[in-house]
Amino acid sequence: MARRRKGRPINGVILLDKPTGISSNDALQKVKRIYFAEKAGHTGALDPLATGMLPICLGEATKFSQFLLDSDKRYVVIAKLGERTNTSDSDGEVVETRDVNVTQEQLERCIASFKGETDQIPSMFSALKYQGKPLYEYARAGIEVPRESRKITVYSIELLRFEGDEVEMEVHCSKGTYIRTITDDLGEMLGCGAHVTMLRRTGVAKYPYDRMVTLEQLNEILEQAQAQEIAPKELLDPLLMPMDTAVEDLPEVNLNAELTDLVQHGMPVQVSGAPTEGTVRMTSGEEKLFVGVAQIAEDGRVAPKRLVVFRDEEPQA
């Protein structure tokens, strides 16, 4: 007997506005239940303290989540000067208190120094893994383990507000950048210590800020569907972004029906006008149905890497 699937095979990306106080995985599970999705995965964890854009991939879109993990991010952060915590945010314990004697000029100069490429050592209170366990589990046990520095790029960092001991900044950065670490480093540069009190992710890749939805809104839609006696998917599914938005920055290679059939069977194909190297997104026919992503092989052929598999009555969002 065929194994019964749990959930429906819905495809697409929902831009969740994660609330504060819950983990990214908790938020993911709530969205998965609301959509009754067979598969779901998020694209880069936010701390429980943090709010904002958490793209959640449903169904076949999970195959392309790595591209969003690797994409640029944007944040607005509020930091409190004068106090350093063991987690570099307000969820932790204050470990040091110092006077704040900082001028606007000093602050702007220190903030500007973070712009560009640099090496950053991840916080012990992060989800990075060491020997299979997240770093924060070691940290909570009072154990410090070695962490390698990682190359990050801060494309822009701007001071939005400086009032008393509170600093508000906007940051555009590469993947793997820890805003808590930047804040802690800033506090040390200023000689007074600092920690994050508010962190909001305002952008991932090129996804529009105004397409985010909250858990409250999703639950209200469920109630609305029940009141109207219609299937929830009729109201929920239009909120999904197409799954190829995760790879929209990749060069497009359009395939005819014959080539589409070959790549869907895992065969590399020769495509006139295709790039000579790198990763591409494949579309099919005049309607440009998203097929998947491919790598350009050494011989110039388009070699399928990750393919979309559609099943009967499966939405193609």
Swiss-Prot record:
Active-site residues, Swiss-Prot/TrEMBL: D47
Example of a GO MF term: RNA binding
Keyword annotations from UniProtKB, A to Z: Isomerase, tRNA processing
Enzyme Commission no: 5.4.99.25
Gene3D superfamilies: Pseudouridine synthase, PUA domain
Matches recorded under InterPro entries: PsdUridine_synth_cat_dom_sf (IPR020103), PsdUridine_synth_N (IPR002501), PUA-like_sf (IPR015947), PUA_sf (IPR036974), tRNA_psdUridine_synth_TruB (IPR014780), tRNA_sdUridine_synth_fam1_C (IPR015240), TruB_C (IPR032819)
Keyword Transport: no
Catalytic activity: uridine(55) in tRNA = pseudouridine(55) in tRNA
Keyword Protease: no
Gene Ontology biological process terms, A to Z: mRNA pseudouridine synthesis; tRNA pseudouridine synthesis
Role: Responsible for synthesis of pseudouridine from uracil-55 in the psi GC loop of transfer RNAs.
Family label: Belongs to the pseudouridine synthase TruB family. Type 1 subfamily.
Name listed for the protein in its UniProt record: tRNA pseudouridine synthase B
Name of the gene this protein is made from: truB
